[in-house]
């Protein structure tokens, strides 16, 4: 079973690399499902994060400074995020994307369960994970994957490594 695990410090280009890998998979005719959690900025200042279903584009706020849910750092989790994420990761696809496995996503029990089901399963996936991930279940599941550590200085090398990993992929 093929999987790619991408990690590195914030702002290194992990999500960009994952997006490029997904584009290559789609060009090969594969159906990719899963989640992406981009940040949202207003006036140059980050105000929160969305959770987006990468297959159909549906979205909800994952966390904002003004939501009502549990706090993670300076943000609070928002209602509706879990539903979008679980639905996206429950679809029947050729390859799954999880961007990212981080503190906010892991704080939502049903989303955590859906992400763990994907990374522990038998379907191919691409996962971006927080560099300080300490969750043993996820670390164990990701240990079977080809890992790429991205930094601002190694983005080009990381892309070459991802292309090499893609060359060994067969659906």
From Swiss-Prot:
CDD domains, per the entry: RecA-like_Thep1 (cd19482)
Keywords in alphabetical order: ATP-binding, Hydrolase, Nucleotide-binding
One function term, GO molecular function aspect: ATP binding
Keyword ATP-binding: yes
EC number: 3.6.1.15
Reaction catalysed by this enzyme: a ribonucleoside 5'-triphosphate + H2O = a ribonucleoside 5'-diphosphate + phosphate + H(+)
SMART domains (alphabetical): AAA
Binding of ATP, residues: 8-15, 95-102
Family from the record: Belongs to the THEP1 NTPase family.
Function description: Has nucleotide phosphatase activity towards ATP, GTP, CTP, TTP and UTP. May hydrolyze nucleoside diphosphates with lower efficiency.
PANTHER family recorded: CANCER-RELATED NUCLEOSIDE-TRIPHOSPHATASE
Entry protein name: Nucleoside-triphosphatase THEP1
Organismal lineage: Archaea, Thermoproteota, Thermoprotei, Desulfurococcales, Desulfurococcaceae
């Amino acid at each position: 079973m093929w999987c790619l695990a991408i990690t590195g410090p914030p702002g290194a280009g992990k999500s960009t690399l994952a997006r490029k890998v997904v584009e290559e998979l789609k060009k090969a005719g594969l159906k990719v499902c899963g989640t992406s959690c981009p940040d949202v900025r207003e006036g140059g200042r980050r105000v929160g994060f969305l959770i987006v279903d990468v297959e159909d584009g549906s979205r909800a706020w994952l966390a904002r400074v003004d939501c009502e849910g549990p706090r993670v750092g300076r943000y609070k989790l928002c209602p509706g995020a879990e539903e979008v994420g679980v639905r996206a990761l429950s679809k029947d696809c050729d390859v799954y994307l999880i961007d990212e496995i981080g503190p906010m996503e892991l704080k939502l029990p049903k989303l955590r369960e859906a992400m763990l089901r994907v990374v522990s399963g038998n379907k191919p996936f691409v996962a971006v994970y927080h560099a300080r991930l300490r969750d043993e279940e996820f670390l164990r599941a990701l240990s079977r994957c080809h890992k790429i550590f991205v930094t601002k200085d190694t983005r080009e090398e990381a892309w070459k490594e991802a292309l090499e990993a893609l060359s060994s992929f067969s659906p």
